[in-house]
Structure formats: structure tokens, C-alpha cells
Amino acid sequence: MSAVVVARRLTVGYGERRVLDGVDTFLASGGSIALVGSNGSGKSTLLKTFAGLLEPLGGVVEVLGGAPREASRSIAYVSQFHRNALALPLRAIDVVRMARFDHRGRFARASVDDETAVAEAMDTMETTELSDVALRDLSGGQQQRVYVAQALARRGAVLLLDEPTSGLDAAGRAAYLRAVERERERGVAVISATHDIGEASTCDRVLLLAGRLIADGPPDVVLTPENLLATFGVGLTRVHDQLVVTEHQHEHGHENGH
């Protein structure tokens, strides 16, 4: 199976400031990767590079066989921050519909396929009843569901998610995990940045990041006390998909960035 996302000796950052060095990885259609690390470890920066929002500082990154920007129509990206949408008088359904028109111009007319994609995405994330509610009037968790629905409505080949379960309650988290499984079944490659070890454990592979690639492999192989110490700078162990502090270590410095 050919790779959909490829990174070779990839260095990412902002301007001349490196945040993450030496990433070598790949992801095929229908596969999933969790990016795990502390704040500033490079998770968000790597996702933005895969999305084509940042140019790599070194190495090679390819999405669907070319530069990420060239594949932007086939990439769905959920950011941590959505200030622009909150500043506008948009309803939840308007936000989800944006996924179908951002590459087609503001005066494009909705097709049956567009409306079907929007309706299915909102149903999947259990936001249909919120369709006509102003985004700014929704709770943080409800807003997050809407943003995930927006990404699903795009029906891209690659789904990039930055802290997708942040603010979600148990029902929202369950809806999200079901949605990801459904996307993978139809061949979508999924990469998520997360602090949720339970979420990470549902992925095929975990990349542990700390300004560099600490480990890349299946969750049961990668999430060891030794690797977690190298990643977070504190003794941790995995207990029932939670990280538990086992001992305190000296402070482990990271460069600023996400």
C-alpha cells in the first residue's frame, strides 16, 4: 500500500527557529498516527507542516505524492484555535458548510453531494440539533464537535486534527472515535496531536515527540516508561490508558513551540 503522508529527515519550525528535528515517518491510506508530547514538543507545528500551512525548514514532506499545498483540496485540518469563526455571526451549519466551499469561491452553489456531506458529518458528531445555533453561543465542547464535523464534511483523503477531543465530554469523545473509525474504513489517513493516551492507543502508531522524534511504533511498543521519560522528562507509566507519575525527575527542557 502506497504512502499518503511521507516525512524524511524533516525539520519544522517558524522562520529560523527550529521546533522539531529529524522526523522520518509515513502513513498509508486508512492508517492512523497519534502525535504525543508535552507543550512545545512540535506536535502542532508538524501538523501545520503536513497541512501545508508552514514550509519545512529542512528535509522532505509529501502528501499524496507532492507538496502539501498542492494537496490542500484533499486535506481536512482541525486547528486548536478558531478565533476567526467565533468573530463572525455564523451558525453551526454555516461553519460545517465552509468545508465544501473554501476552494470553490464564495458564490458557489451547494450541490446535493455538498448538502449530503454536511448533513452526514453533523449527524456523525451529533450536532444536527445545533444547526441553527450561533457558534459563539455554543459551549466549548459543542464548538469542538462542530469543527470536527466541518473536517468530516470536507471528505478529504487526509484528516489532520490538533487536540480533537479537547473539551469533549464522554459522549462527544465517543462520537469522535466512531467518526475516525468510519473515516479510516473509507481509506482516509488520520493524524492527530493529542495528550489523551486513551485516544492515542486507538491509533496504529504513536510518534513520541520532544523537539525530536523519540519513538515511532505501535502504542503497546512505544508507550514504555523509558520512552515516556525521554518525552516528558518525568517518570510516567501507562495504567488503563492514563499516564501516572511514578517519580519526579529533573526538569526536561523543550524549545518553545507546539
Segments predicted by a language model, with ranges:
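ABC ATPase nucleotide-binding domains
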Residues: 224-258
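Catalytic Walker B motif of ABC-type/P-loop ATPase nucleotide-binding domains
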Residues: 159-163
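Conserved ABC transporter NBD signature motif
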Residues: 56-73
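Conserved ABC ATPase "signature" region
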Residues: 97, 112-130
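The feature captures the beta-strand-to-loop junction immediately N-terminal to the Walker
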Residues: 36-38
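H-loop (His-switch) and adjacent beta-strand-loop-beta switch element
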Residues: 203-219
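Helix-to-loop junction immediately C-terminal to a conserved catalytic motif
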Residues: 51
